[in-house]
Amino acid sequence: MTMLPGNYLGRKGGSGVAQWIINKMPFHDVYIEPFCGCAVVASLKKMAMVDNVLIDKNIDLIRFLKTHYSSYDNFTVLNVDCFSFLDTFICDYVGQGKKVLVYLDPPYLPEVRSDYVRSQYEHELTMLQHRQLLSLMRDRLLQFPKNLYFIISGYKSDLYMSMLQDWFYFEFQTMSRGGVRIESLWTSFNPDEYIKHQYDYVGSTFTERQRIKRKCDRWISKFQKLSFDEQMVIYESLKNTLNI
């Protein structure tokens, strides 16, 4: 059966899930998303300037994405096995001195999926492949300690908690086909120590993001009422304070 992008399994279209993930992303020149599915996260985030690499083995989804992003020069959409190409992209771009972010949302482990029997992907991962994926990330971080960042989604499991025990761990309550679940996120870096790739989704909830947006709107309104010289004094002060 052909899976349409709108109802693809595992899509990060749940309320606030994609925004929560994007808010953890540090600034990057290259964005790589293996297991991209219908690319909800990629569609909501700010594009990376150098390249945005979307990889999936589902040919129908890739055809859809190629059509959707055909007008962009900095999008690479591939219908390949990520195990064959992910390492190449990482080594090439980090080797060029680019800041590379890899976001992975692989099919979750069967043991943590309450609806595994009813809902399975066209292309699942074996336990061995999950181990290979986690090992690849750890190995590349040792090889490239700078300019390489990993984020991976999943449900909490013994395998992930043990192999990523020195990573940063976050949880978010969401609604899945099997009911309310706790979405887990592991990052190879501390998100609080890096300039974010974008600040559109700062705030843990929609209500919090709206509160921050209203505050920004009020401050901008006050700023626009000042004289040009006063605006420049504030601008220079902010530059010096933030070291930008």
Regions flagged by a language model, labelled:
Residues 1-244:
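Class I S-adenosyl-L-methionine-dependent methyltransferase catalytic core
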